[in-house]
């Protein structure tokens, strides 16, 4: 199992090719059984400050193409990006995909023929607006593997690992001057 963002399918294809056909996409389980989840990731395109007006104009033109032009959006999505626009996210072409294309142009039913984008789009529609990242999110994510890894290798239970991770985060928060409730 892997709890991750919608950007992961193409990373799996390129990074774990032997998993081809063995993975499936599902909604993340929650304690109360709801389908609510949180955002994990995203991407940004920026223009760095420059006195070269031609370069700035070209960069802006590219950003417009990549983010607002249907062809540019399709190019990014075909390359593995998750769509940031609702038209693509709701399109039948996107929702009905069952295969990923590798860098050699070969199609792979990495998720066993599943319409994987249907699940990813459903998850995107159910992102909670009340979720907030920790002010020390990078620390928290970095420490998670330290504790979850012990559960994965059988040195402890997942429940105990999560409890230890929580205590670590509470201690760290207090050390950094945050009030822990």
Each model region followed by its residue ranges:
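Extracytoplasmic/periplasmic substrate-binding proteins
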Residues: 1-61
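Acidic, low-complexity intrinsically disordered regions
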Residues: 3, 19-21, 106-107, 112-115, ...
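A generic secondary-structure signal for well-formed alpha-helical elements
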Residues: 6, 16, 69-70, 169, ...
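Conserved C-terminal helix/tail region of periplasmic/extracytoplasmic solute-binding proteins
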Residues: 106, 118-181
């Amino acid at each position: 199992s892997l709890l991750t963002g919608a950007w992961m399918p193409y990373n799996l294809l390129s990074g774990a090719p032997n998993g081809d056909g063995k993975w499936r996409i599902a909604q993340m389980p929650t304690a109360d059984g709801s389908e609510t989840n949180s955002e994990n990731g995203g991407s940004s395109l920026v223009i760095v400050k420059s006195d070269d007006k031609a370069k700035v104009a070209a960069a802006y033109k590219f950003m417009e193409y990549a983010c607002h032009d249907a062809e540019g959006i399709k190019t990014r999505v075909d390359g593995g990006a998750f769509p940031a626009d609702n038209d693509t996210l709701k399109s039948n072409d996107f929702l009905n995909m069952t295969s990923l294309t590798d860098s050699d142009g070969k199609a792979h039913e990495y998720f066993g023929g599943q319409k994987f984008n249907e699940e990813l789009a459903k998850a995107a529609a159910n992102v909670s607006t009340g979720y907030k990242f920790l002010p020390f999110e990078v620390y928290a994510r970095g420490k998670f593997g330290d504790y979850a890894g012990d559960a994965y290798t059988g040195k402890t239970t997942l429940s105990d690992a999560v409890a230890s991770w929580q205590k670590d985060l509470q201690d760290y928060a207090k050390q950094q001057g945050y009030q822990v409730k």
